[in-house]
Structures are given as structure tokens and as C-alpha cells.
């Protein structure tokens, strides 16, 4: 589950890393050799920075003509009961991935949850109302029920949306854009694996 992954990453941050939650970067500028980052309630001054904002690089006016954000929405069921799990054949953990980068994906997790993502759209996730999210959740429930009609209607436990960054030629960004300023992003749906790989090199 993405939430568990993020919490685990936060819990293992090194002591020299500070985390600021609910603090989106509003603006940034460079004066001489000082980079000034403006947040909602504070500012940070630094001499070096890596903008690792992936799909939000464009909103920071970084590589604006190179990448574009796409909103994906996913849903995950609660853990299936013994009876429900038996009704679908008691499968081992599995996943079906799309041939195309933005195609649908569905997975069965070790703890008997079904995860489905079958929406990819140009939509601002910060403006997605609960009503809009519920519409996408209904679409995903239909997808699960089409394959597993024996499962109950209240099977979905959580739904969420997020941003991936796409480029026309499916290449990533990890480069120096100015003195002491670097940008990382455009993983084209490859996510944490590719991001980590670029960060380590």
C-alpha cells in the first residue's frame, strides 16, 4: 500500500534529513548563489538544491516543455475473508501489468487484497473532490466485479489519486539545470525503482 510505503520511508530517514509535511513549494528563485524557496509558512535558503518533484516540475517552471503530468487513480480492497479467498481459487500473489505505460493494472497482494488502477487522465489531483474520486472508485469496483462477480459490493477499502510524469520520448530527467541546481523526474510510470536508481548514480 502506498501509504505504508511512505510511512516506512519516513520512519527510516537519516538524522541529517528534516521532513516538512503539508508544505508545498509555492515559489523559488535564485539570487546570485543563493536559492530561495518559499513555502506556505516559511522560506528556506540554500546554495544547492535537487528538485525531485517528478510530475510537478512543470508547475515550478522547470523543463516546462519537456514533461506533462497525468493523474492516476487506484483502489484497493480490504483483505478477503477465507470464504471470499476460496471463491476466487485461493491464488498466490500475482499481478497483471499493461503493455502500454498508462494501461490498467490489477494485482493480488500477499495479504489477500486486490489493487486496481484503470484510470489515466489529465486532471489536477489537488482539485479532485470526494464526489469525483467516488466516481472513479465505482469504475474500479465494476472492474473488480466483472472479473470476480462473487465478491460483495462493499469490497473496496481505500481509493486515492496521484501524479505520474510523462515525456514524449519516454526518457527521464536527471540533470543539472543551473549552477548547483538539479532536477529529477519524468519516470513515465516507473516510479520509485527508477527514481532510486537515478538517485544512487
Residue ranges, per PLM feature:
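Active-site substrate-recognition segment that forms the wall
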Residues: 27, 43-44, 48-83, 87-159, ...
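Secondary-structure boundary/capping motif
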Residues: 1, 29, 166, 191-195
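Mid-domain beta-loop-alpha active-site segment that forms a flexible
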Residues: 1-10, 101, 136-143, 198
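Helical element adjacent to the flavin cofactor pocket in flavoenzyme catalytic cores
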Residues: 1-48
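Hydrophobic/aromatic beta-strand patches that form the interior of the parallel beta-sheet core
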Residues: 20, 50, 182-184
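Short, hydrophobic/aromatic-rich segments at coil-to-beta transitions
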Residues: 33-36, 91-92, 180
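A conserved FAD-binding loop/helix module that cradles the flavin
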Residues: 126-133, 182-201
Amino acid at each position: 500500500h502506498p501509504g505504508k510505503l511512505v510511512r516506512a520511508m519516513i520512519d527510516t530517514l537519516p538524522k541529517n534529513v528534516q521532513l516538512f509535511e503539508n508544505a508545498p513549494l509555492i515559489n523559488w528563485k535564485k539570487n546570485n548563489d543563493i536559492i530561495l524557496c518559499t513555502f506556505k509558512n516559511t522560506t528556506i535558503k540554500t546554495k544547492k538544491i535537487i528538485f525531485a518533484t517528478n510530475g510537478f516540475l512543470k508547475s515550478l517552471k522547470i523543463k516546462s516543455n519537456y514533461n506533462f503530468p497525468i493523474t492516476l487513480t487506484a483502489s484497493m480492497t480490504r483483505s478477503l475473508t477465507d470464504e471470499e479467498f476460496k471463491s476466487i481459487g485461493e491464488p498466490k500473489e500475482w499481478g497483471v501489468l499493461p503493455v502500454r505505460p498508462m494501461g490498467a493494472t490489477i494485482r493480488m497482494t500477499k495479504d489477500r487484497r486486490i489493487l486496481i488502477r484503470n484510470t489515466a487522465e489529465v486532471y489536477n489531483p489537488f482539485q479532485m473532490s470526494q464526489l469525483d474520486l467516488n466516481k472513479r472508485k465505482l469504475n474500479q469496483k465494476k472492474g473488480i466485479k466483472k472479473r470476480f462477480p462473487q465478491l460483495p459490493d462493499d469490497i473496496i477499502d481505500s481509493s486515492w489519486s496521484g501524479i505520474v510524469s510523462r515525456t514524449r520520448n519516454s526518457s527521464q530527467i536527471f540533470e543539472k539545470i543551473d549552477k548547483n541546481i538539479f532536477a529529477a523526474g519524468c519516470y513515465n510510470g516507473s516510479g520509485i525503482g527508477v527514481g532510486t536508481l537515478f538517485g544512487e548514480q
